[in-house]
Amino acid sequence: MPLSRNSSLKRSPMKTQRAKPSDEEKQARALVRVRSGGWCEMRLTGCLGEATDFSHRVGRGQGGPWSASNGLAACRRCHSWCHSRRTEAEDLGLILRSGQDPTVEPVAYQNAGFVVLDNLGYLWPVLDEEIA
């Protein structure tokens, strides 16, 4: 049956395809949220301040785990910057390569120097001579 100009199309609502978060994801997100206090942990130039994203240091597609050491709370602008300027983000430890250990690799933290993140949601300052 052909459509006429006066007939209306029925639209159905789009269904979300996102799976329910795992326990590991929930725990990692909660620990990072507490550590950051809801603020962007990257604090790059142009930072929006409030954290809205969970930024993986080792990407999920590269085998990166859901863990507090592998995640940073980020505003959308800082998170986008990391993906558009990958080499610079790697130099700052904001993005790691597959196989790198996020519990060992230092990360530039809120313009306050380099720290090492652990899986309990803590951060540990790194002395300048420890950064190679």
Region spans (language model):
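Short linker/helix segments within small regulatory modules
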Residues: 58-71
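Glycine-rich loops and low-complexity Gly/Arg-rich segments
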Residues: 67, 77-80, 98-101
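Histidine-centered divalent metal-coordination motifs
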Residues: 55-56, 79
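Short, surface-exposed beta-edge/turn micro-motifs
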Residues: 37-38, 70-72
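A short glycine-/small-residue-rich loop at the edge of a beta-strand within enzyme catalytic domains
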Residues: 19, 23, 66, 73
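Short Cys/His-centered divalent metal-binding micro-motifs
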Residues: 45-49, 71-92
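A boundary/linker detector
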Residues: 1-39, 43-51, 90, 96-132
